[in-house]
Amino acid sequence: MPTVLAIAVALGLSTAQLQERLLYGSLARQSLIAFAWLSSPPPGQALGLDKSRYTPKRHHGLVAGLLEQVDSGEIRRLEIEQPPRTGKSELAVRKFVPWWMGRNPGKSLIVTTHSDPLANEHGRDCRDVFESPAYQLAFPGRACQLREESKAMDRLQLRGGGVAIFTGRRGLGAGAGADLILADDLFKNSDEAESPAVRDAVWRGYNADVESRLNSEESPVVLIGTRRNEDDVQGRLFDPTNAHYDPNQARRWTRVRLPALAETGDPLGRLVDEALWPEKFSAEFYLARRNHRSDIIRIEHQTQDQCNPVALEGNYFKRRWLATYEAAELPKHLRIYCASDHAYRKDQRNDRQCLLVVGIDPSDTIWVLPDTWWERATTDVLVEQMIRIIGARQIGRAHV
C-alpha cells in the first residue's frame, strides 16, 4: 500500500497539502453544507479548499441538517417552504442530489418539478457537480462515479448502479421506482396555481405517481418549494380546513416554514420581522412589499415571501359583491359609519392603520366613502384623522 508521501509525490502535492485535501474530502462526505462549500469553488478555480462561492446562512444550515436526517432515515417525509431566491434549489437539489448519491451509490432517486426544462437544468447542474474535483475528492470510490454512457441531463447513472432521474411533473407517472423522491416547486407560477384544474391535476399526480414510485414504505419524500396558493399541494396536505386534508397523512410529515420576515416561534430563533437573508433581501425590502398599495404585491408577499397563502377571495367578502362607482352616483341620504383597525401590537409595526368610512343607503347597500384613510402613522396623527372625519361627517357619537 503506497504511503501518504508516495501519494503526495505522485499528485505533485506536499504531504500537508494532501492531508488537507483528505480532511476536506472526509468532511464533505459527512456534511452536506461542507460539500456545498467544497463544490462551489471561486471563479477560475477547479477546487477551492479555503474559499468558496457558497456562503451558507442560518437557514441553509437548518435545511442541510434536515436533509441529512432524510439520508440517515430519521425523517421519512420532509416539507420545507422558503421564499423565492433564497437558495432552496441550490442546496436541496443541485448539492443534495450528488451528495446523497455519493453516499448511496447503489440507490435511485427521482427529482420532479413543474416542467421538463427546469428538470433538465437541475440534471445538467447535478452532472457538473458529479464531474467536479470536489465530488471526486469527497467520493473517490469507483462505484460513486458516473457511467460514461449514462450522462444524459434527465438520467444520470453511477457505476454502483444508482440512478438519478430528472423529470417534469407530467413525466412522473411511468418508469422505474426510487429510493427517494424530491419534488421541487410543482407549480411554475401563480397563474398555474390559480387554476383549479391545474391544482387538481398536480394533486392527482402527487398522490398517484409519487407514492407509487417509491421502492418501499421506508423510502423518503422531500417536498420543497415556494407557496403559490392556499389550495396547493402543501395546503391540501397540511391545512385542516382544506377538503383534502387527511390528519393521518399530515402527521407523517416534518414541516418547516421559513418566512422572509420572522414570525412568532420562528424555527431559526429570529426576532419578529427579522429578514431571512438580510445580506440579500433586507427587512425593509419585504416590509415595503407587505405594505404596498398594490393588492397583487401584498398578496404575493403574504403567499410567496411569508409562505402563508391568502385567498384572492376571503371567507367573508367575495369579489362579485364589490363594484366601483363614480362620484355622481353616490346617494345623498346615507347612514354614516366609521370603523378603525389599528396596528398596535409589537409584531405589527410598520403596518398601515385604517379608518374605514362607509355609508348605507335605504336599500342596505354599503358605499365605501372617499374619505376612508389608510396610512402608516403615529397615534397622534391617527387621532387627528379621526377628529377630521367626525367633523366632516357630523358624527354624533364616537367610540375608541
Feature-to-residue mapping (PLM):
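N-terminal accessory segments
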Residues: 1-75
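Conserved P-loop
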Residues: 80-138
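Conserved nucleotide-state-sensing and coupling region of NTP-binding domains
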Residues: 112-173
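Conserved RecA-like ASCE ATPase "motif II neighborhood" in helicase/translocase motors
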Residues: 150-209
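ASCE P-loop NTPase helicase motor core
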Residues: 194-266
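ATPase catalytic-site recognition across NTP-hydrolyzing enzymes
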Residues: 265-342
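An active-site-proximal beta-strand-loop segment
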Residues: 340-353
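Nucleic-acid-processing active sites and adjacent nucleic-acid-binding tracks
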Residues: 356-397
